[in-house]
Each structure stands twice: as C-alpha cells, then as structure tokens.
C-alpha cells in the first residue's frame, strides 16, 4: 500500500474567519470572533439533529459541509443526536429503541461515540 505525506499549512486568523463565515447568512459578533481568532482562543461549536428518519442530503451536504469548514478552522465541533427530543415529539412512533437504532446509523465511523441521555 502507499502512504502519502503532506504538509498542513497553519491558517491565519483571517483565513480561519473566512472559513467560518463561508456560506453563512450572518455572524453575530464578527469583531469579537475575529479577536478570539487572533488571540488563538479555542472555539467550540455544536449542532443537534432531531431523529425523524434516515438522514437526507441536506444533513450531509449543507450541515456537514459547514461542520467541515469549522473543523478546518480549528473549531472543536460536537454533533448531538437529539434522541430525547425525538421521543417527546413522537418521532418514529415515539419508540426510543427505534430512535436510537436509526440515530446510530447516522454515523458509522469507528471513532463515533454515542452518549444516550
């Protein structure tokens, strides 16, 4: 097999800001965000999905593309699968076991971890 090596360029604060801003409508506190990036502060982001069935292209293309931008900008990202919200909103018949089974199929990578609340 072939192993490839490549250099990863450290992004400037401005480059990180542009990644974060890409394909967004609005950023509240742009100046504060720029200052945090200049200072090298660690940023965190989370996004949550109510489980209502199998994921669709909007999840994969739009939401995950933005998560990738954030991760590329050095932001620590968490993705929450809102099983409890799905249950109380009677998604998938309100069956928590089915909800968890469907949710577990959203991400099949070995490094995915599921915390059920």
Residue ranges of predicted features:
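Structured alpha-helical segments in the cores of large, soluble enzyme domains
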Residues: 33, 68-75, 102-107
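A glycine-rich helix N-cap at a beta->alpha junction
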Residues: 99-117
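Short active-site-proximal "capping" loops at secondary-structure junctions
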Residues: 50-54, 84-87
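A glycine-rich phosphate/pyrophosphate-binding beta-strand-loop-alpha-helix module
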Residues: 80-100
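Non-catalytic terminal extensions that flank enzyme cores
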Residues: 2-52
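Short, flexible active-site-proximal loops enriched in glycine and acidic residues
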Residues: 73-83, 114-117
